[in-house]
Regions:
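Active-site acidic/histidine proton-transfer and metal-coordination neighborhood
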Residues: 12, 16-17, 41-46, 81, ...
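N-terminal substrate-binding region of glycoside hydrolase catalytic domains
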Residues: 51-67, 90-94
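Hydrophobic faces of well-ordered beta-strands that scaffold small-molecule active sites
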Residues: 27-33, 56-58, 86-91, 125-127, ...
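Short, contiguous strand/loop micro-motifs
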Residues: 31-32, 61-63, 99-101, 136-138, ...
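Glycine-rich, proline-tolerant flexible connector loops at the mouths of alpha/beta enzymes
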Residues: 58-76, 132-135
Length: 296
């Protein structure tokens, strides 16, 4: 019997066309659509492809905007016509992880986003942990069920659900808390964002807690030479232009068995020309990856 995902993709055999394996080791450069969101869905992808980018991370909001005036088939063609492989997607759904009265509605929104991303040939999606409020220790026990339910929704579409911890989240802001929850849930994997790891409450030593093959996806940025109190999403730097210990983290991830995309997610350059920006990012980031010995 066909799964829901297979049924969605079979008309164009899209899953086969878009499947990518990183089993042979090494890491590849990818671009997150948040980095060039001002250019829209088509503009960002076409510009990056001209610059030699082959792996991309999709933003649900940009896909939604594209579908307001075009079709899902057209959205797929933007990927295939430009030789692009979508390696992950941001579902853009709040309230998935922390206990809150709108959790059931959040799961329904997640279900719609998973269906959309499955049609685009993705295998992984993630939700961020941005949350406000005051929480207690018992809330983390309840959160295990929330994490598990999100993983179950994603699995309906043969998607792997991932958690991205956010440095200033009031609920899940560290790698250690993320590992605790994903391990307890059992069906959701942690992902790692360099900026959130290196500028928040996490420590470099926390990387030693990662089990082999546990990290499912990585966002790649540098940190500028600023007082830590001034670091924000807007200060994220192109890999290779800051002071972060990028090669150390990359080598640690390699030793922990990570062999996947490094997706550059920045917010300062969203209105820049996607082609020129991707050229600059590729030159700088791939030099760092080569120095670390992880570039495939």
């Amino acid at each position: 019997m066909l799964t829901r995902r297979a049924a969605l993709l079979s008309p164009l055999a899209f899953a086969a066309a878009r499947t990518v394996s990183f089993a042979q080791g090494g890491m590849t450069l990818a671009m997150h659509q948040n980095t060039s969101s001002g250019a829209g869905y088509r503009g960002s992808l076409e510009g990056w492809a001209r610059a030699g980018i082959r792996h991309v991370e999709l933003n649900a909001g940009l896909v939604d905007q594209f579908l307001e005036t075009d079709t899902m088939a057209a959205a797929r063609r933007v990927l295939t016509d430009n030789g692009l492989t979508p390696v992950s997607g941001s579902v853009g759904v709040g309230g998935l992880w922390e206990p809150n009265p709108d959790h059931a509605a959040a799961l329904e929104t997640l279900r719609r986003r998973c269906e959309m991303f499955a049609e685009l040939g993705l295998e992984k999606v993630y939700g961020s942990t941005g949350a406000n409020g005051t929480f207690s220790e018992t809330d983390y026990d309840a959160a295990v069920d929330n994490v598990r339910q999100a993983g179950e929704v994603a699995s309906e579409f043969d998607l792997q659900m991932m958690v991205e911890f956010i440095r200033n989240s009031a609920f899940i802001s560290t790698l250690t808390t993320t590992l605790r929850l994903t391990r307890s849930a059992g069906n959701v994997q942690p992902m790692l964002d360099f900026s959130h790891l290196l500028t928040g409450l996490s420590q470099l030593g926390d990387l030693d807690l990662i089990r082999p093959g546990e990290i499912a996806h990585v966002h790649f940025q540098d940190v500028p030479d600023l007082p830590r109190e001034l670091l924000t999403g807007q200060t994220r730097a192109i890999p290779g232009t800051g002071i972060a210990p990028l090669t150390h983290v990359l080598r640690t991830l390699r030793d922990k068995g990570y062999a996947g995309p490094l997706s550059v997610e920045l917010f300062l350059y969203q209105d820049d020309d996607p082609y020129e920006l991707a050229r600059e990012i590729r030159e700088s980031a791939e030099a760092v990856m080569m120095e670390a010995g992880v570039l495939r």
